[in-house]
From Swiss-Prot:
This is Translation machinery-associated protein 7 homolog. The keyword Lyase does not apply. Keywords: Coiled coil. Residues 53-64 have a biased composition (Gly residues). Residues 27-50 form a coiled coil. It comes from Drosophila melanogaster. The keyword Transport does not apply. Residues 27-38 have a biased composition (Basic and acidic residues). Residues 39-50 have a biased composition (Low complexity).
Length: 64
């Protein structure tokens, strides 16, 4: 490797792969994943509306 050839031989970005044809199983799997993601987002939204689950209990003072 001479001084003129310095640097990386590979390009920084890899060429994009061709999108493969999805069969029915893949489509069903992707649809199921989307539904699970939506359910998770809805659960997060509901959880953020309410306060903390544990609010009471023994409170410790800063003194010893």
């Amino acid at each position: 490797m001479s001084g003129r050839e310095g640097g990386k031989k590979k390009p920084l970005k890899a060429p994009k792969k061709d999108s493969k044809d999805l069969d029915e199983d893949d489509m069903a799997f992707k649809q199921k994943q989307k539904e699970q993601q939506k359910a998770l987002e809805a659960a997060k939204a509901n959880a953020s509306k309410k306060g903390p689950l544990v609010g009471g209990g023994i409170k410790k003072s800063g003194k010893k």
